[in-house]
């Protein structure tokens, strides 16, 4: 296979409203099967996507769907086309001083329009790829990628084929359009005034139809293992926690729970103590025995302490039970080992409260870590109302005080977003 990559020289400065296809057709000589790689900047200029530089930040805001990462003034964002890139593609290079360029509003539509017009003007069967320069995760340096395409299959799926050793290819899907964009940039460069390149010798990649454009190249945020920067992911991990009351029947990975417990025991605690214990109820039989005993204790309290009749007790205890429906339970316990003894009730109460706060911090860490593992959770206070019963059923030491129970499982539905503004909970003195 022979391959040529040719820069198309002689294209003049492009202004808004220019016939870009006409300028490209006039500047080069084309053949059937040629693939034209066109830098996005000349497309944007022809489409009038030019702003005053003073409007740059506002333009980035307008083009941004979500912020992926922020480092000082620099922003990596997802734009309306699904591209994850620096500054939403708003760029001050290769444009007049005091101006910035936006990406084409619909790069695939731009590629289709260019292809149609160029094929009319040249009489050749062509493909068009609109390119832009991106940074890359895991690696330094920039390279061009495809942001718009027409007449080209942008991906080549090798899955199911075999390599030269007979091994089946299971995951290999080649980003053909990106490979072409990067190769073409070798002759286009960044400051040479050559905005278009021809890749010749790959005519078999050119399709009769315009095709799906670059959409197949764009990984949905929900499928992206690296959808946030490190700092952003750490912040979001805390706020993503929700109380989940409905679970699937999928089993819970005990190793994931133990990783969450490892996070839980990093919580702060008084006097250099470790006041947390986590009882993991991995046996269905144990869960049922505990919940049945707790139900009996609850019914006794309603009957003997609250004076309820049997019908009212039955109605109250018949309501849905998130603990009984969960595939996994954790019973966090507080131990007061290392606490200080005080002779007066004020300081004794404060000492107990210090340890209780530490227990709560451990439970919160557990819940947040479970969210990071992909599990939903719900903290329920019920074991605190029948601690003796819980200790008896689970054979726990007398000094272990159950501090509720945590239901764990895969959420049956996506938890609803909850917005709470910090100012509603803040007083400044």
Swiss-Prot record:
Q: Can you tell me which residues bind a divalent metal cation 2?
A: 133
Residues annotated for a divalent metal cation 1 binding in this entry:
91, 132
Which positions does UniProt annotate for GTP binding? 11-14, 40, 45, 94
UniProt entry keywords in alphabetical sequence: GTP-binding, Ligase, Magnesium, Manganese, Metal-binding, Multifunctional enzyme, Nucleotide-binding, Oxidoreductase, Potassium
The protein's matches in Pfam families, at most eight in alphabetical order, are given as:
F420_ligase, Nitroreductase
Required co-factors = Mg(2+); Mn(2+); K(+)
Function according to Swiss-Prot or TrEMBL? Bifunctional enzyme that catalyzes the GTP-dependent successive addition of two or more gamma-linked L-glutamates to the L-lactyl phosphodiester of 7,8-didemethyl-8-hydroxy-5-deazariboflavin (F420-0) to form polyglutamated F420 derivatives, and the FMNH2-dependent reduction of dehydro-F420-0 to form F420-0.
Q: What is this protein called?
A: Bifunctional F420 biosynthesis protein FbiB
In which organism is this protein found?
Answer: Kitasatospora aureofaciens (Streptomyces aureofaciens)
